[in-house]
Amino acid sequence: MKKIIILFAIFSLLTGCCAKTNYDKGFSFNYSSQSNSSYNTSSWSTTSNNGVLNPNSSYSSQKKTTILGNNKDVVTIMLYMCGSDLESQAMMGSYDLQEMANAKLASNVNLIVYTGGTTKWHIDGISTRYNQIYKVLGSGQIKCLVDNAGSAAMTNSDTLVDFIDYCSINFPANRYELIMWDHGAGTVSGYGYDEKYPNSGSMSLAQIDQALTEANVQFDFVGFDACLMANLETAIMLSEHADYLIASEESEPGIGWYYTSSL
């Protein structure tokens, strides 16, 4: 098979059937086999992108979250952090919590974190025995809101429902955002690995859908700080629950998102 691939590559170079790629300023493709004018462009927009949102477009008009703007929005970010071996072996959860604590959060933003799912936390005070709920205060500080939120597996959809319910009741807002932090396996296995319950499996897309339906909160976006969760199946599943999906279709590095500048 390798010989076939190599021979095909050599043949392509000799015959010039490959597209030329210019890497000087991004990607630029020139197709020598046929002219671009032969494509049907009847459905393409002739209006240039000016960077301004068009509220009359069919997609933006379908948004379910109302954004007030002018610093009038109250935003509650729910971060569901199942630490797993990413925390116990590599401190990745602790690093990300520190990044969040170092962020400059506006007074109208509530960042609430649910912790659990690992046999060892590297930040003093975070329990490995119980799941807990924290509020990120900024200036390097986090505050424990719920010292004992039970010890259920974080891959259990009921645990996610309980967290969303807690946040929506105690931190009401006109914009809700959910970030699910851990391992991810896309359509195959869904989200999460709870190191304390290695036989509990992961949370499938169907179970995530069930949890979000039961919680009945409309999200501005649902994000997965996890591998392989950006796919059509996940997007379709979330279409009734959120306006946007933020995720990676590729494997992420263990450290995941950089929160200090993004929050």
Which role does the model predict for each range below?
Residues 9-13:
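Hydrophobic core
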